[in-house]
Amino acid sequence: MANDKLNISPLERAIDRLSEGWDRYQSDTSDAQILDGLIQRFEFTYEISHKLLKRHLEANSANPAEYDEMSFQDLIRSGNEQNLLLGTWTDWKRYRNMRSKTSHTYDENIANEVVSGIPEFLTETRHLLVQIKKRLA
C-alpha cells in the first residue's frame, strides 16, 4: 500500500465529531442524549484511530504482513517507536477498555468513566493525525 493513498479523512471527521460532541456535553452535562452521542462518537473515533495507525504502519513497512499478526500491544509499541503516539501501551489499553465497556453494557458509572477519558483521548488522536499528515506531506 502506498502511503500517498492512505485516507486520513475518516479520522479527521471522527475527531471533529468527537470534539463537537465534547463541546456540547460541556455546555450541558445533564443531557443524557448528548452523553449517549458523545460515547458513540468516542467509540467510532477509537476504532478509526487504531485502524488508521495499523494501515499507516503497514504502508511504511518492508513487511506489511507482520502487522496482521501483531498483537494490539505491539501495534501500539510500534506506533510509539515511530513517534506516532503520545500515549503508552497503558494509555491505549485504558482507551481499549473504555471502548469495550461501552459496547457490552450501559451503566451511568461506566459512561462517566468513559467521558472522563475523552479529553486525553482527543489529544492523543489529534497527535496521531498530525504525525501521519506530516509523513504524508
Question: What is each stretch, according to the model?
Answer:
Residues M1-A137:
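Solvent-exposed interaction patches of small proteins and small membrane subunits
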